[in-house]
């Protein structure tokens, strides 16, 4: 049973979009984030959940993705306009923690050719997994462009040491219906991951990158 109504979410989305598109329009595409505060949860004792959800519409079309590819995938990446690194490029990092950390910071997500995925931990150590950015595999039969779109449309809820999390659920160029739908999907999915469902939800807020926060719960 959901504790928030579609009408309430819609009213807040209207306000948020009005602020970002009329009151204070920025010269870049603002992302809309769902910020969650949890309660009655002990990250030390309770199971730290993690789950991914593919949204119908990509929340961050400009999200940066890098491909670790064999020759075939590096070529495909170039034609899709996506950054790519070959095995030699990865070897050049020489397991240098600083450089790998920098790489993990530079991109929001990674994709790797199936043939390379097993080599990633050996070449890069545990840094990408620690950052929650272990690459998604792609095979030569997959359409690379669709795979990149899938990765850009997938959001991840992962509880770490603190009781708050934030995920991108949309952007301010989306229409009201799309944004409302993406928010409700994300909230329901998150609640399903929690041990006591709604009893673990302390607060739900939506916010555009530079805009004020609107409280849903």
Curated annotation (Swiss-Prot):
GO biological process: ribosome biogenesis; translation
InterPro entries, A to Z: eL8/uL1-like, Ribosomal_uL1, Ribosomal_uL1-like, Ribosomal_uL1/biogenesis, Ribosomal_uL1_3-a/b-sand, Ribosomal_uL1_CS
Record protein name field: Large ribosomal subunit protein uL1
Keyword S-adenosyl-L-methionine: no
Molecular function per GO: RNA binding; structural constituent of ribosome
GO CC term, one of those recorded: cytosolic large ribosomal subunit
PANTHER family hit by this protein: RIBOSOMAL PROTEIN L7AE FAMILY MEMBER
Similarity section: Belongs to the universal ribosomal protein uL1 family.
Key words of the record: Ribonucleoprotein, Ribosomal protein
Underlying gene: RPL10A
């Amino acid at each position: 049973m959901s504790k928030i109504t579609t009408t309430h979410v819609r009213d807040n989305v209207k306000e948020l979009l009005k602020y970002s598109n009329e009151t204070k329009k920025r010269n870049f595409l603002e992302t809309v984030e769902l910020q969650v505060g949890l309660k009655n949860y002990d990250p030390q004792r309770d199971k730290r959940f993690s789950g991914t959800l593919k949204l119908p519409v990509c929340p961050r079309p400009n999200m940066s993705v890098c491909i670790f590819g064999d020759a075939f995938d590096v070529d495909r990446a170039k034609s899709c306009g996506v950054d790519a690194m070959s095995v030699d490029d990865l070897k050049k990092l020489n397991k240098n923690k600083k450089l790998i950390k920098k790489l993990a910071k530079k991109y929001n997500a990674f994709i790797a050719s199936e043939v390379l995925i097993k080599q990633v931990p050996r070449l890069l150590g545990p840094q990408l997994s620690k950052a929650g950015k272990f690459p998604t595999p792609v095979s030569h039969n997959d359409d690379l462009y669709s795979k990149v779109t899938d990765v850009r449309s997938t959001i991840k809820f992962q509880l770490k040491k603190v009781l708050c999390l934030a995920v991108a659920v949309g952007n301010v160029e989306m229409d009201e219906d799309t944004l409302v739908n993406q928010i409700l999907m994300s909230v329901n999915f998150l609640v399903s991951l929690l041990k006591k469902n709604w009893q673990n939800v302390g607060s739900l807020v939506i916010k555009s990158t530079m805009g004020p926060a609107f409280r849903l719960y």
